[in-house]
């Protein structure tokens, strides 16, 4: 079995799709079933898996500004959408006996053995959670990928069911390959977490944590409204810590963040380096993730793996990931989210149960399983 794997998602800042691509390709590189693995980046082959450098938050801000600039160039975006897959196809013209895997939706034109990973299809089901330019670009590109793909991988049973429901694609050619998190995400002692806590001026189990892109789909505005319903004494004792690079703008959200920051119960850390995240999770009192829509929900799995209680939404893929380990609520029910957050902060009996259940639930997910499921799916071609 000979594979060409597209490495474009492996870049700073490393998103959930980037993490999936990195962890999967590392394991494919040593899998005995893979006779040869070639790495494809942009429109050319590369010799090594890209290195994700740790960079300052200034660089993350620059990334956000560059993305904003590109969104204002519709002709440039459309030209790229039309030309890039053709450039890729030309570079791949002599590799017809290879399976090509695009881990981030997109595929070159007219490949005979093409595999794509669809992480979610919120562009089609919830376009209001995305910038209009992204919707226009991805709707066209995803339909082209559907036309080209001989096999679709997806990351949850929920996402698979959505693809089956919305698209006329052979059911037997849609495979679920569930995600996992790094082995760095484990329970840790206060002493182990101390350097990171000191770096960010935080206290052991002295905060609630959100990790993820700061964008409307994540329902951060609802999270802030729910947190604001907690008694001020509780908010000051357990401030809400937000981490993640800025997605597309939401002026109301940032007004709420600034207000909470002035009042002392919110802190926005920006994009936190990968090496700090396991400690930031492990030292948290609770993890909160009331997202409107997820294809998987990797941060929930990371939190459970660290032994941290979870409060999340009861929609899309999140119940599939959290199982019976967390408190779940309708993402539109601010009162219920607030009540669950309060319980996760104060109810020690529930917290003990949630920690044990979360650790057990997290063990069901591993990158080894994801890799095995992926290779088994390749065999369908």
Go through each PLM region and give its residues.
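Carbohydrate transferase catalytic cores enriched for Leloir-type hexosyltransferases
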Residues: 1-381
């Amino acid at each position: 079995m000979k594979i060409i794997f597209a490495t474009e998602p492996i870049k700073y800042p490393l998103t959930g799709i980037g993490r999936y691509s990195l962890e999967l390709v590392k394991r494919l590189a040593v899998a005995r079933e893979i006779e040869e693995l070639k790495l494809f980046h942009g429109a050319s082959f590369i010799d090594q898996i890209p290195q994700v450098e740790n960079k300052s938050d200034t660089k993350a801000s620059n990334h956000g500004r560059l993305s904003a600039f590109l969104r204002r160039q519709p002709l440039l975006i459309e030209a790229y959408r039309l030309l890039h897959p053709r450039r890729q196809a030309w570079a791949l013209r002599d590799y017809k006996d290879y399976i090509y895997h695009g881990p981030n939706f997109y595929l070159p034109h007219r490949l005979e053995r093409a595999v794509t990973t669809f992480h979610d299809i919120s562009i089609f089901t919830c376009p209001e959670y995305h910038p209009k330019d992204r919707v226009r670009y991805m709707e066209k590109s995803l339909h082209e990928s559907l036309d080209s793909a001989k096999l679709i991988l997806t990351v949850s049973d929920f996402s698979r069911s959505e693809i089956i429901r919305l698209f006329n694609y052979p059911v037997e050619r849609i495979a679920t390959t569930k995600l996992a998190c790094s082995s760095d995400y484990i329970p840790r002692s206060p002493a182990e977490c101390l350097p990171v806590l000191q770096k960010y001026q935080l206290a052991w189990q002295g905060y609630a944590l959100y990790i993820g892109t700061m964008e409307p789909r994540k329902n951060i505005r609802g999270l802030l409204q729910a947190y604001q319903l907690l008694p001020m004494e509780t908010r000051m004792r357990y401030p809400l810590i937000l981490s993640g690079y800025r997605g597309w703008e939401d002026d109301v959200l940032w007004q709420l963040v600034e207000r909470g920051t002035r009042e002392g119960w919110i802190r926005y850390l920006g994009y936190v380096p990968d090496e700090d995240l396991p400690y930031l999770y492990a030292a948290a009192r609770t993890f909160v993730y009331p997202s409107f829509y997820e294809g998987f929900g990797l941060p929930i799995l990371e939190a459970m793996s660290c032994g941290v209680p979870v409060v999340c939404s009861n929609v899309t893929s999140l119940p599939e990931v959290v199982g019976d380990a967390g408190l779940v609520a309708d993402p539109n029910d601010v009162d219920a989210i607030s009540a669950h957050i309060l319980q996760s902060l104060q109810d020690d009996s529930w917290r003990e149960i949630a920690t044990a259940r979360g650790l057990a639930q997290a063990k069901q997910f591993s990158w080894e399983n994801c890799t095995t499921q992926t290779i088994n799916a390749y065999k369908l071609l």
